[in-house]
């Protein structure tokens, strides 16, 4: 694991990872320095898709806004 990158994780009530964010070390969760992935599951809790905020892996999103961002 790279020490210059931090990771934030958010799980649903079933324990499934829903959001994974990465940002430069020292970033706050309110800064626009995050790349965020959303994990999509089917009704049987099988992972079916992985999507990026804004459809890309740029470090330009805010972790605290992860739920309201657009993913593709």
Residue ranges with predicted function:
Residues 1-72:
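Viral virion structural and adsorption modules
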């Amino acid at each position: 694991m790279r020490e210059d990158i931090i990771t934030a994780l958010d799980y649903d009530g079933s324990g499934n990872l829903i959001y994974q964010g990465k940002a430069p070390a020292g970033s706050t969760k309110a800064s626009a320095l995050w790349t965020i992935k959303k994990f999509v599951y089917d009704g049987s809790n099988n992972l079916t898709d992985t999507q990026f905020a804004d459809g890309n892996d740029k470090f330009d999103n805010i972790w605290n806004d992860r739920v309201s961002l657009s993913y593709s």
